[in-house]
Each structure stands twice: as structure tokens, then as C-alpha cells.
Amino acid sequence: MRKYSNIKKIKKGFTPLEVKALTGFTLLETLVAIFVITVGLMGVMTVLQMTMFLTSISSSRLTAAYLAQEGIEIVRNVRDTNWLEARTVANDWDEGLTNCSGGCIADYTYSSQLDPILLAYAGQFLNIDGNGFYSYSPDTPTKFQRKIIIQKPNFDRLDVAVQIMWSEKGKPYNFSAQENLYNWR
């Protein structure tokens, strides 16, 4: 019997097959990866959208701050012009400035001999010309409105408040600046 000793004995039952390890992804792993990538991209898109919106708001607020400061400077210019023109007692330092308690606009492009620079506020929008100057002359309309309110609490003081209003993506915004001007002459 040794004659067949080189023959391997057959094992009874199932013999395991040699299976190589699979290197691909399962369907579940693929779906999880797609979900993670989608959530990440949505987060990035949301951050970009908010950044663009806040950049627009910041730009508008900066413009509003400059327009408010310009409104105060216009009122200061009228007061200083009154001083320089050596107004008489009948034409005081605050001439042309005391009729704005309900609100005025500063139309410095208005030309007449009396130069009524402060006119009644009626919700007018500022316009911008080709050089970037804001005024009420017929140019390109903007989203900004400027309202100048001047109160005279006593003989030697004017309280100047400038409100800038605008709307951004359907939401109203405003910016205010205040200054006290005195008859220090």
C-alpha cells in the first residue's frame, strides 16, 4: 500500500476556496461618502452665500455712513457761509437751517440767488452721476434716501441728525449720525 502514499487523502466535506480580498467599495460605503461630500459642499456654499450678502451690506453701510457725514457737512457749510457773509441780526447764523424740524434734503445743486439748499423731505431717493457724486439731480437712481432733521433747543445750538435709509434684498436698513453745531462766533 505504500505504493500510493504520494496521493493526498481527500478530505471529507466542503473545502474552502481561496478567495482574494475584495478591494472595491460597497454600495453603503459609496452612499455614505456621497452624503459626506454633499454636506461639506452645502456648508461651503452657505458660507460663500453669507459672505457675499454681508459684503454687500458692509458696502452699503459704508456708503450710508459717508452720505450721513456729508449731510452734516452740508449743514455746517451753510452755517459757516452765514458767518462769512457777515449776516446782520435779521439774517442770523442759522438762517435757512431752522425749517428742517420735520426733515429736509440737502440739494446743493440747486441754483438761485437765495440758494435754498435745504428743501422739504418727501422721500426722495439720491441719484449718482457718472463721476460718483450723489445728488438729487436727474441721474442714475440709487437705493439711498437721506433725511436731515435740525432742531434748535436753544439760541446758540443746533442739533443736526441725518438718517440714511435703504433696502437690501427686501430688508430695510438705516444709518444715523448726529452732531451739535454752535454759534461760537
Predicted regions and their residues:
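Low-complexity, Gly/Pro-rich coil/beta segments used as flexible assembly/activation regions
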Residues: 66-185
